Amino acid sequence: MLGRTLREVSSALKQGHITPTELCKKCLSLIKKTKYLNAYITVSEEVALKQAEESEKRYKQGQSLGDLDGIPVAVKDNFSTSGIETTCASNMLKGYLPPYNATVVQRLLDQGALLMGKTNLDEFAMGSGSTDGVFGPVKNPWTYSKQYRERSRQDAQEDSHWLITGGSSGGSAAAVAAFTCFAALGSDTGGSTRNPAAHCGTVGFKPSYGLVSRHGLIPLVNSMDVPGIFTRCVDDTAIVLGVLAGHDPKDSTTVNDPVKPTTLPSVPDVSGLCIGIPKEYLVPELSSEIRSLWSQAADLFEAEGARVIEVCLPHTCYSIVCYHVLCTSEVASNMARFDGLQYGHRSAVDMSSTEALYAATRQEGFNDVVKGRILSGNFFLLKENYENYFVKAQKVRRLIVNDFVNVFGSGVDVLLTPTTLTQAVPYLEFIKEDNRTRSAQDDIFTQAVNMAGLPAVNVPVALSSQGLPIGLQLIGRAFCDQQLLTVAKWFEKQVQFPVIQLQDLMDDGSLVPENGKLTSGSLTQ
């Protein structure tokens, strides 16, 4: 049951094949069994069981709230959850109990979803590995998969070479990949949903900016932050998006126009579409395996009758630097609220002045990565630097936006790109580089989309020669999220990404792949 799609489980609940309480207990048991992944910061067992009980009553009365009623979900720990600790994986917010739910959380709960817990992340979502939070790093479930152990000859008991999940929403990606929930919320500022989705073999969707409310998402970069969605298939993403999308009076950046339900065709058709391949994304650092899969994917579209053309995004080479300036500048502004007076941790050290209290509180509350980004942002915002850095970066951002406008205006429907440079790497290799360097490397294909406010989705396509997931990214026009997901659904059906084989789960029957074996895929190595 845990290996089924959200829609399939919803159907099973409606037909009485399983109850919400039984399903909830299965997921809670699996969360405990996979605790070594460190995917969750808080497991809300009592809350989830109570919600399951209420869902069960509705099913018995024939009053199901919809496809999400009784479905276990998880939420990244930078979304406010009423009465449930929300920490952003930081000492600054340890013990913080929000008095309200983020809008996206409330919309899930209003549809009967079961909140299994809050997932791990990089501190304040600043990172690309989910390794820098105060609660420790998240481990990629594929580290313990049969596919990886066999192809890389890793000892099942050897834990020194475990793989990162990507970040910053690595806990949500791991939670979905390990079957502890059927969907999870992440956040995406420069790729924080798509990056871990690629490394963990899940669908990771970033909606158009303004389609989904940010109210209750503890801000990192207000002009780029978007709630993201993790699921194990594109249809499930569409179901969740249909619940989350729409105007929110508490978030003035959300669209006012009514949003139609996100319904994808059962048999998607991409013939006649124009698929763009950005030539600037063919960088030397891109692994040969991903490069090959990218080319094969383009061939699949062409074989189906789509027109595949090379396109130019000329300002791509400036995007990482531009993103860094704008990101850290907004970080410095947003983090200023954590001062020991209004929000978060307050230093217990006896201080002689307010300034000293600020300094001690922030020294104790933030890790070095967060402090480093605050320092960078404050530098760019200094009066003598403002024009040369921040204002120029805003102008470059406009040029990057115009690049996408020109490409989509020329008749291109969707862009096809890599999501990451490489497959997931071992933790010991990842930490050889500092957080700033790693983030610049890992955001290379993803952050420009955030600056342009476009929808994008990672689709897992194949396993590498080492048995690890590789994903590709599809980018759509602004507010053409449904078209993008339709194309993604077609692509997903073509590649037939294999089911992860976690031996611990196979042994006790918690998860059995269809027909007891993996599905063969169209993209091979």
Curated annotation (Swiss-Prot):
Job of this protein: Allows the formation of correctly charged Gln-tRNA(Gln) through the transamidation of misacylated Glu-tRNA(Gln) in the mitochondria. The reaction takes place in the presence of glutamine and ATP through an activated gamma-phospho-Glu-tRNA(Gln).
UniProt GO MF annotations: ATP binding; glutaminyl-tRNA synthase (glutamine-hydrolyzing) activity
Any one GO CC term of the record: mitochondrion
Location (main, coarse): mitochondrion
Domain of life according to the entry: Eukaryota
GO biological process: glutaminyl-tRNAGln biosynthesis via transamidation; mitochondrial translation; regulation of protein stability
Principal EC category: ligase
SUPFAM superfamilies to which the protein is assigned, alphabetical: Amidase signature (AS) enzymes (SSF75304)
Cellular compartments annotated: Mitochondrion
Family assignment from sequence similarity: Belongs to the amidase family. GatA subfamily.
Annotated EC: 6.3.5.7
Protein's recorded name: Glutamyl-tRNA(Gln) amidotransferase subunit A, mitochondrial
NCBIfam families found in the cross-reference section: gatA
Annotated catalytic residues: K76 (charge relay system), S168 (charge relay system), S192 (acyl-ester intermediate)
Catalysed reactions listed for this entry: L-glutamyl-tRNA(Gln) + L-glutamine + ATP + H2O = L-glutaminyl-tRNA(Gln) + L-glutamate + ADP + phosphate + H(+)
Matching Pfam families: Amidase (PF01425)
HAMAP family for the chain: GatA
Coiled-coil zones: none
Organism: Rattus norvegicus (Rat)
UniProt keyword terms in alphabetical order: ATP-binding, Ligase, Mitochondrion, Nucleotide-binding, Protein biosynthesis
Subunit structure, interactors included: Subunit of the heterotrimeric GatCAB amidotransferase (AdT) complex, composed of A (QRSL1), B (GATB) and C (GATC) subunits.
